[in-house]
């Protein structure tokens, strides 16, 4: 019996440490099957609803391709194409979608919305991103880390997340570290540290996993001897220009660049980025943002560092597909046979 059957994925703490590592192992198998053209369609006749209140490239494509590869059908419900929470309550929408579909993905603004969907739909609900958590991204990150260091335990791996940690990525990184025992350093000004209650809980949980979690403003302390430096954009579309200005001023000295890589004292240090990245000026939007705030060579990461690490970064992005596929398979099948 598959103990993940009919389970939601709203945040990583929905799973035990063993369950999380089993999902990663399943993702490795599914990735290998796809690479070898030996995909086994386990989700035939399954129907999946994809609710996107916030638009996306990687999340939408990963869910759609994962479903198609496995023989499932999807319905894309984009921004403005449902009455969710406007003409129809979230509860009522959840109840009807739960009758029509075998599973629901939600990507939107409020974590409370996905909690209501999960409570009322009676089918598995998966979090594609909310303002509080981004679990499918962290599953891809853990798979990427495991592929690079297959022989090492997670508690033997040091990872520094540099930048804004007061967001869904900071919260989900904390939860991931607390479950698998990662040695995690969140390197940011205090104003950009994660929520205290989540940090405190995860700090307590990790004591049983041999790993460690710290928050520090000190870049030298945070990145010394790490195996990975991880960063994300400092600003998001839809936020006010006042928020952008304040955050960029706070984070301007936390850019991932060649000097920061030298500070790690690890010539083999790897760089992760969950994308999109403001590393060059090849789009009008990014060009105008960089010019406005006085950045000539990328914002949160320089183009030089991005290009040197692009193989890993794009592998990390591809791994969204394989880990999401593992979530779909594990939550929609009573038993999993290969």
From Swiss-Prot:
Q: What class of enzyme is it?
A: transferase
Q: Where does carbamoyl phosphate bind?
A: 56-59, 107, 134-137, 274-275, 320
The entry's cellular-component GO terms read: cytoplasm
What EC numbers are recorded for this enzyme? 2.1.3.3
One Pfam family linked to the record:
OTCace_N
Q: In which pathway does it act?
A: Amino-acid degradation; L-arginine degradation via ADI pathway; carbamoyl phosphate from L-arginine: step 2/2
* PANTHER family documented for this protein: ORNITHINE CARBAMOYLTRANSFERASE SUBUNIT F-RELATED (PTHR45753:SF4), ORNITHINE CARBAMOYLTRANSFERASE, MITOCHONDRIAL (PTHR45753)
What's the protein name? Ornithine carbamoyltransferase
């Amino acid at each position: 019996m598959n103990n993940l059957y009919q389970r939601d994925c709203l945040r990583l703490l929905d799973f035990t440490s063993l369950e999380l590592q089993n999902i990663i192992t399943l993702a490795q198998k599914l990735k290998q099957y796809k690479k070898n053209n030996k995909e086994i369609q386990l989700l035939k006749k399954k129907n999946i609803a994809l609710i996107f209140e916030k638009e996306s490239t990687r999340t939408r494509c990963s869910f759609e391709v994962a479903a198609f590869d496995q023989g499932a059908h999807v319905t894309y419900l984009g921004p403005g194409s449902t009455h969710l929470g406007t003409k129809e309550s979230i509860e009522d929408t959840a109840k009807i979608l739960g009758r029509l579909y075998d599973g629901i993905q939600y990507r939107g603004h409020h974590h409370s919305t996905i909690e209501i969907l999960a409570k009322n739909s009676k089918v598995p609900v998966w979090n594609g991103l909310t303002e509080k958590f981004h679990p499918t991204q962290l599953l891809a990150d853990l798979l990427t880390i495991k592929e690079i260091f297959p022989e090492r335990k997670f508690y033997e791996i040091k990872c520094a997340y540099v930048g804004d940690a007061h967001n869904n990525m900071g919260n989900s990184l904390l939860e991931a570290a607390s479950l698998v025992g990662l040695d995690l350093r969140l390197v940011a000004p205090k104003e950009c540290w994660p929520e205290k209650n989540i940090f405190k809980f995860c700090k307590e949980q990790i004591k049983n996993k041999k790993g460690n979690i710290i928050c520090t403003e000190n870049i030298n302390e945070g990145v010394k001897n790490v195996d990975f430096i991880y960063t994300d954009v400092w600003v998001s579309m839809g936020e006010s220009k006042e928020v952008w200005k304040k955050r960029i001023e706070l984070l301007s000295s936390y850019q991932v660049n060649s000097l920061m890589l030298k500070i790690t004292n690890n010539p083999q240090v790897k760089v992760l980025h969950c994308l999109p990245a403001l590393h060059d000026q090849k789009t009008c939007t990014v060009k105008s943002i960089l010019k406005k705030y006085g950045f000539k060579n990328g914002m949160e990461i320089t183009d030089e560092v991005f290009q040197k690490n692009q193989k890993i970064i794009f592998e990390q992005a591809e791994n969204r597909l394989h880990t999401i596929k593992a979530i779909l398979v594990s939550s929609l099948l009573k038993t999993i046979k290969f």
